[in-house]
């Protein structure tokens, strides 16, 4: 439809000001919904976060793991319609849907992928924009055609029907952008992004889920809980997610972007970016899981561009979980 073609990339340098209000079409994200009499108890027994205590006006990050504690999905959970919504990378949903439904046959619960449109509202005027849709004070609000979910200060996710999305876009004077700007904000906030290529690779603590309030250590059993608890109480986790920044001589695409680290006079592979954002002035940034004992001044470089060195940037939060 015509409204879907109005979004365009916003090419920003590291020095450019951000829009006071932007709406991004987040077609790289999708949502799994869960409804039914047993939705709360079933989901509570599957994921790292505390579903039982989640209030109607709250959202939380969480992870869904396999029995060995490896992450299938990192999601934002909130009340949506008659059940729950779990926003996550769209590419991860095919496998995650199969895994999260594995034991659902024993419960009164319906789990499926949503067809709703996901938009990202950001900027100093974002809160006012959402308040015009619903003046309630909560971080999760019912709006026409769906739900508004606060991610952080001046940043909201809108999950709405296509008709509602069209009305929002046609009646807004916001800067309309494609997903890249939202990805930049997620990287700057160090919010983990687990696409299909990163599924079943890391435990939740390696993705900093504990530092973001996405793990409850008091909720009881859930799939992968033993590994997650062992990582906390026995210190078995040796990895964490970091922001990395550097220069790039050519455009970065959606192919796997490998990094190497300096080891003496040599270079050794250190991992693959989970996600990345490229500025218009040859600067770029990304998220990557690294050993958590690396020095802050460890030299990194792009494997495909050996002359382009990168560094580890400061996280916006502590890696402690309490």
Swiss-Prot record:
Biological processes, Gene Ontology terms: iron-sulfur cluster assembly; RNA modification; tRNA processing
> Pfam families from the xrefs?
YgfZ_barrel
Q: Name one GO cellular component term.
A: cytoplasm
Q: Which residues participate in folate binding?
A: 182
Which GO MF terms does the UniProt record name? folic acid binding
Question: Which UniProt key words apply to this protein?
Answer: Cytoplasm, Folate-binding, tRNA processing
Family that this chain belongs to: Belongs to the tRNA-modifying YgfZ family.
Write out the function statement from the record. Folate-binding protein involved in regulating the level of ATP-DnaA and in the modification of some tRNAs. It is probably a key factor in regulatory networks that act via tRNA modification, such as initiation of chromosomal replication.
Could you tell me which HAMAP family the record lists for this protein?
A: tRNA_modifying_YgfZ
Full protein name? tRNA-modifying protein YgfZ
* Source organism of this protein record: Vibrio parahaemolyticus serotype O3:K6 (strain RIMD 2210633)
At the highest ranks, the source species' classification is: Bacteria, Pseudomonadati, Pseudomonadota, Gammaproteobacteria, Vibrionales
């Amino acid at each position: 439809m015509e409204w879907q073609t109005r979004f365009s990339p916003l090419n920003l340098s590291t020095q450019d000001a951000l829009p006071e209000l932007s709406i991004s079409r987040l077609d790289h994200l999708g949502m799994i919904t869960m409804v039914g009499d047993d939705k709360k108890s079933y989901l509570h027994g599957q994921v790292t976060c505390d579903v039982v205590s989640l209030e109607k006006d709250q959202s939380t990050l969480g992870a869904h793991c396999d029995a060995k504690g490896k992450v299938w999905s990192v999601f934002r959970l909130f009340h949506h319609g008659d059940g729950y919504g779990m926003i996550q990378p769209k590419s991860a949903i095919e496998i995650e849907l199969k895994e999260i439904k594995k034991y659902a046959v024993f419960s009164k619960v319906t789990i499926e992928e949503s067809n709703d449109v996901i938009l990202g509202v950001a900027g100093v005027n974002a809160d006012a924009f959402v308040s015009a849709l619903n003046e309630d004070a909560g971080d999760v609000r019912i709006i026409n055609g769906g739900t508004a979910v606060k991610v952080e200060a001046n940043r909201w996710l809108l999950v709405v029907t296509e008709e509602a999305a069209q009305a929002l876009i046609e009646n807004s004077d916001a800067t309309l952008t494609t997903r890249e700007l939202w990805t930049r904000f997620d990287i700057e906030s160090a919010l983990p992004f687990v696409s299909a290529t990163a599924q079943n690779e890391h435990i939740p603590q390696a993705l900093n889920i504990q530092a973001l309030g996405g793990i409850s250590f008091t909720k009881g059993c859930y799939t992968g809980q033993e590994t997650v608890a062992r990582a906390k109480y026995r210190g078995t986790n040796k990895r964490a997610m970091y922001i990395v920044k550097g220069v790039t001589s050519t455009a970065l695409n959606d192919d796997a972007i490998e990094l190497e680290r300096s080891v003496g006079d040599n270079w050794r592979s250190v991992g693959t970016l989970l996600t990345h954002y490229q500025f218009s002035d040859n600067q770029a940034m990304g998220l990557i899981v690294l050993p958590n004992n690396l020095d802050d001044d460890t030299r990194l470089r792009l494997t495909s561009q050996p002359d382009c060195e990168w560094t580890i940037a400061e996280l916006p939060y502590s890696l402690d979980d309490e």
